[in-house]
Swiss-Prot record:
Region annotated Alpha N-terminal domain (alpha-NTD), chain positions: 1-232
Function comment: DNA-dependent RNA polymerase catalyzes the transcription of DNA into RNA using the four ribonucleoside triphosphates as substrates.
Organism, scientific name: Rhizobium meliloti (strain 1021) (Ensifer meliloti)
Lineage: Bacteria, Pseudomonadati, Pseudomonadota, Alphaproteobacteria, Hyphomicrobiales
Domain remark from Swiss-Prot or TrEMBL: The alpha-NTD is essential for RNAP assembly and basal transcription, whereas the alpha-CTD is involved in interaction with transcriptional regulators and with upstream promoter elements. The alpha-NTD recognizes upstream AT-rich elements and the alpha-CTD interacts with the transcriptional activator Fis in reconstitution assays in E.coli.
Name this protein carries in UniProt: DNA-directed RNA polymerase subunit alpha
NCBIfam families: PRK05182.1-2 (NF003513), PRK05182.2-5 (NF003519), rpoA (TIGR02027)
Gene Ontology CC terms: cytoplasm; DNA-directed RNA polymerase complex
Domain of life: Bacteria
Length: 336
């Protein structure tokens, strides 16, 4: 069966997120098949840094400034430094259309991202970020163009041919994810000691949580990889269909050693080669009492346990035992 290629690989039964504020989070996923920690960690990291959409300033116009190599009277930073500071403004914006936002301030004092006047669907996430410093009597007015996008776009690609004089294009850092690191360690699952444990640390600008960022990255990978799947998935039976096909109570597939029986009773059943409840209920009381070392006390104990399950000795199960009893027992173990 082709589906065993992926169905029999172990999947993490422990996926935990620990958040430190809105900007930092740690993911722990274990166990993974050996080698999958590195495979998934590296793939998620690359997608997180390159492919998630965010908002950034794409251009700025400063009153009285014609190009980025100018200086502004009364402003301590030159325009080049101001542009570098503008690149670090963290923004969350809804919609895909370009938006404008403005800042106007008089000195003395510091101009921060929190001084920017925004429209309703734009949020400044780092309002204390310094843009420039004004001396006494100085005044500055800046108008920013904001867009949504992904990855890194250099200033040259943000320069339009019909741009007005004085509009300075800015390198756009759209990615909401600022840092990602991961490590892979050994972990244990049952008797296997060399499964992988993946730990990822994510830092964002606050426009998206670390947990959501990983979910988006995983969805991107899922969507990209789906084009390589050249076959239809085998259809899974619904629980109702599966139960209908089974000609007997799924509880009969439960092993008798899972019942809470005394050691004496359990040993007697084992010695009589009674493995499943389906084997047990087809025995009569007389047959059970002929079992070596099996007495009336053990019989009453078993009758009580079966009664609690709606079963009794001496029942007839025409299709018992099924040919694939072990597979059926695994398939229906959550139904008894």
């Amino acid at each position: 069966m082709i589906q065993k290629n992926w169905q029999e690989l172990i999947k993490p039964n422990k996926v935990e997120f620990a958040s430190s504020g809105r900007t930092k989070a740690t993911l722990v996923a274990e166990p993974l098949e050996r080698g999958f920690g590195l495979t998934l960690g590296n793939a998620l990291r690359r997608v997180l840094l390159s492919s998630l959409r965010g908002a950034a300033v794409t251009a700025v116009q400063i009153d009285g400034v014609l190009h980025e190599f100018s200086s502004i009277p009364g402003v301590r930073e030159d325009v080049t430094d101001i542009v570098l500071n503008i690149k670090e403004i963290a923004i969350k914006m809804d919609g895909d259309d370009a938006k404008r936002m403005v800042v106007r301030k008089q000195g003395p004092g510091v101009v921060t991202a929190g001084d920017i006047q925004t429209v309703g669907d734009i949020e400044i996430l780092n309002p204390n970020h310094v843009i420039c410093t004004l001396d006494e009597g100085a005044e500055i007015r800046m108008e920013f163009t904001v867009n949504n996008g992904k990855g890194y776009v250099p200033a040259d690609r943000n320069r339009s041919e019909d741009a007005p004089i004085g509009l300075i294009p800015v390198d756009s850092l759209y990615s909401p994810v600022k840092k990602v690191s991961y490590k892979v360690e050994n972990t244990r699952e049952g008797q296997v000691l060399d499964y992988d444990k993946l730990t990822m640390s994510i830092e964002t600008d606050g426009s998206v949580t670390g947990e959501d960022a990983i979910a988006f990255a995983a969805r991107i990978l899922q969507d990209q990889l789906s084009v390589f799947v050249n076959f239809d998935e085998p259809q899974k039976e619904t629980e109702e269909e599966a139960v209908t096909e089974l000609a007997f109570n799924p509880a009969l597939l439960k092993k008798v050693d899972e019942l809470e029986l005394s050691v004496r009773s359990a040993n007697c059943l084992k010695n009589d080669n009674i493995v499943y409840i389906g084997d047990l209920i087809q025995k009569t009381e007389a047959e059970m009492l002929r079992t070596p070392n099996f007495g009336r006390k053990s019989l009453n104990e078993i009758k009580e346990v079966l009664a609690s399950m709606g079963l009794h000795l001496g029942m007839e199960v025409p299709s018992w035992p099924p040919e694939n009893i072990e597979d059926l027992a695994k398939r229906y173990e959550d139904q008894y």
